[in-house]
């Protein structure tokens, strides 16, 4: 009986210790996610080769950022630091894939213009709108981006020429609140042009795959924002569930979609095992 009491006492002590340790670990993880990881931006370099990629564009650096969600949980001061980091990547082309603001933005919309205007890219700055932008005031968000030097693409394309090669930057309308029309966006694009598509929601890739799009850049999902080891993200939004994070290839095709983890947060100001990200794409022509 005495040994049984000792075993029970030992079990209770160990159980209490385990519960306390878990609570402490959860608290530490929460603090890390709120005050640490969500500001610890990772620069990811992705190298890809394509038969259709023009040799004259080799060495061009395409830099993507997404989902800044400027507002309650992401300040203009923090956005200034993002711009500094983007510029250090020496971009030739800058692509923003939507959700500039997180909530009603008031006068902060004008204050962000000089910050975004500091971004320099010799071949252009391009953007599409996200679902948060569409829900609030898409015309105003578009105006902010355009006054900051971005070309906002809505079912349309822009051609970039270098040497004897040409690259088409195509932007699709937002899927949840807009009217995406890929055939319209590709109108005038020649069959041998390399096509870089900006689409806020990554699951648009299923449509892109059946077209002449070569590389789709997306955001929206934040990579899940909170990712549990050995499990993955605990939540991904509508149209961000099939291709929620990183690079995805498709059998029998050179087409890829890359889902950027974004800069800011939404719903809760926390990231765990899912650092904010900017992505640098270095593409090259695939030899026969």
Regions found by a protein language model. Name each.
Residues 60-141, 148:
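Membrane-embedded segments
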Residues 65-66, 94-98, 125-131, 153-155, ...:
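Active-site neighborhood of phospho(di)ester-bond hydrolases with catalytic His/Asp-centered motifs
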Residues 44-47, 111-180, 187-189:
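Extended active-site neighborhood of metal-dependent phosphoesterases/phosphodiesterases
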Residues 50-62, 158-169, 250-256:
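Beta-strand-turn-beta hairpins that frame and shape the catalytic cleft
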Residues 202-282, 287:
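Conserved beta-sheet core of the metallophosphoesterase superfamily
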Residues 25-63, 73-77, 81-84:
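C-terminal segment of N-terminal export signals and the immediately downstream linker at the start
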Residues 1-22:
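N-terminal secretory signal peptides and thylakoid transit peptides that target proteins
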Residues 59-69, 166-174, 196-199, 256-262:
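Active-site-proximal beta-strand elements of phosphoester/diester hydrolases
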